[in-house]
Amino acid sequence: LAPIRRERYVEGLLPQLIAATAAFAVFFGVAGSTLLNSFAVPTEEFSAWDLLTGVGLGIAASVIMIVFVLIVKLVQAVAGKVSNGLVRGLVGGGLVGVIAVALPLTVGAGNDQLSAVIDESATINVWLLVAVLIGKMLAMALSLATGFIGGNVLPMLFVGGTAGVIVHLIIPDIPYAVAVSAMLVAVPGAVIKAPIGLTFIAVLSVGLGPLTAAPVAIAVAASHITTAGVVAFLRAHRADVPEVHT
């Protein structure tokens, strides 16, 4: 392999630093807050078993992302039958509104809602959280399929964090901090090629220590590898498997 010139790293890094700084300045100027320590997750003593747990959580996160992609493709297929864009948007917006009324935790990007889920997880029924999880993915799919504009990353962080709470409630032996922080970023990490950046998001937003960050990084890697493996397998047997974009 030809050696990579050191100048290329600088050429690639500087625009990213400038873009990230500008984005932070705009976000902080508008929102007046950051994601630092946004989610009050209790700290727990690190165990070597947490590393293996990270693998399992990563695989579970991959399954959630695959289910989301299937929901999106199904909704897009149905929405595509409506030729009039105005009617399609009207129906899509109405359905998103119905979901929001039935499941208020699905409203918005998900930052404040995830904080509420984490803070009240001891009193929220696990099946209600499952309904919220499915409702959020369905609302996102409807938005994407019917012409609404918005990003996927923050809503998928909500999906991941909520899934982590569900995992802990179903399997209490999995530490709360590990389940929430790992699933928080492993779900979007299934398709986003930024494992280090996603791990930092979990560390900074949850306030993890360096040891707890290890299973998070493993979960992100396991999620991405699992998803890539499934996609490669399907493409080997079916030529029409779509690309996954975020």
Across the structure, where does each feature detected by a protein language model lie?
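Alpha-helical transmembrane segments and immediately membrane-proximal extracytoplasmic
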Residues: 1-246
